[in-house]
Amino acid sequence: MKKYLALALIAPLLISCSTTKKGDTYNEAWVKDTNGFDILMGQFAHNIENIWGFKEVVIAGPKDYVKYTDQYQTRSHINFDDGTITIETIAGTEPAAHLRRAIIKTLLMGDDPSSVDLYSDVDDITISKEPFLYGQVVDNTGQPIRWEGRASNFADYLLKNRLKSRSNGLRIIYSVTINMVPNHLDKRAHKYLGMVRQSSRKYGVDESLILAIMQTESSFNPYAVSRSDALGLMQVVQHTAGKDVFRSQGKSGTPSRSFLFDPASNIDTGTAYLAMLNNVYLGGIDNPTSRRYAVITAYNGGAGSVLRVFSNDKIQAANIINTMTPGDVYQTLTTRHPSAESRRYLYKVNTAQKSYRRR
């Protein structure tokens, strides 16, 4: 994977964690870096379209694991929102064999995103004794899948009973789809509860907020990537929020991709950034509920854009917020923030946080 340009120092107030541009000002190096990644993704999508056909482009995202193999002729797609696993191939010879191999590897893949290149067809998926999907999928007998023998038997069952084919005019696409268990989201969340609790205690951030951010950002997908090159469970961008957190901790440079793909490191960094937003960048907001709404929105779109909703002067913006009720602050941010994504983001995270508080 291409090494990216380092980002020069930016005013911390103008940094968001999960996005790279929300109307805030970035320097030329960051713009060039972002444009370079956009070009890379555009080329990758174009290559997939050439091989698979028009409207058949599927690329990894925050809530979608997509891995190509077999010279891009086979792909595994886990939709963590819908709870479905779709294995497809356009291989002209022995398509069932290609599907079988991909099914087994997907069911038994480990929890090490840094070892997998989602932007190539390199077959770098290794079978793990502790599969990431263990408990999130059961076989045709209702049993979770840990060992290769059970995965192989399930693959044979799927190919015999659920194999489908369709034509897109260019290729015949063979596929099988596996439904994850109904509570797959909770199963994934449970994997990270210990890490969340540790970061919560370390930075004084509510566990329910961390979990709500993780659910909204990645649906607890540790392989999460985005077109803005945000990485991991909490979708941290190396050169913005990642660098800001490192600087606050007395570290130089930026967190590496492998660092942010490590679940514990990602949760620690994302939570540290939430604490910075709460205690420093938006610390002038007195009411804790109003400040929480501002922090949530800022995690997506930057603290600067949040304050500018109320005034172009940062101090005056905080003063205005302090005259408002929390309900009015919420209403303002969900209706007047210039970014539709940030407006929806506050609603989603706030709703998710309520559900975690009830548990």
From Swiss-Prot:
GO cellular-component term (any): cell outer membrane
Lipidation (N-palmitoyl cysteine): C17
Keywords from the UniProt entry: Cell outer membrane, Cell wall biogenesis/degradation, Lipoprotein, Lyase, Membrane, Palmitate, Signal
GO biological process, one term: peptidoglycan metabolic process
Location within or outside the cell: Cell outer membrane
GO molecular function: hydrolase activity, acting on glycosyl bonds; peptidoglycan lytic transglycosylase activity
Catalytic activity field: Exolytic cleavage of the (1->4)-beta-glycosidic linkage between N-acetylmuramic acid (MurNAc) and N-acetylglucosamine (GlcNAc) residues in peptidoglycan, from either the reducing or the non-reducing ends of the peptidoglycan chains, with concomitant formation of a 1,6-anhydrobond in the MurNAc residue
Topology in membrane: Lipid-anchor
Signal sequence, renumbered to the chain: 1-16
Main location: membrane
Lipidation (S-diacylglycerol cysteine): C17
Origin superkingdom: Bacteria
Alphabetized Pfam families for the sequence: Mltc_N, SLT
E.C. no: 4.2.2.n1
Biological role stated in the UniProt entry: Murein-degrading enzyme. May play a role in recycling of muropeptides during cell elongation and/or cell division.
Family of this protein: Belongs to the transglycosylase Slt family.
Protein name: Membrane-bound lytic murein transglycosylase C
Taxonomic classification: Bacteria, Pseudomonadati, Pseudomonadota, Gammaproteobacteria, Enterobacterales
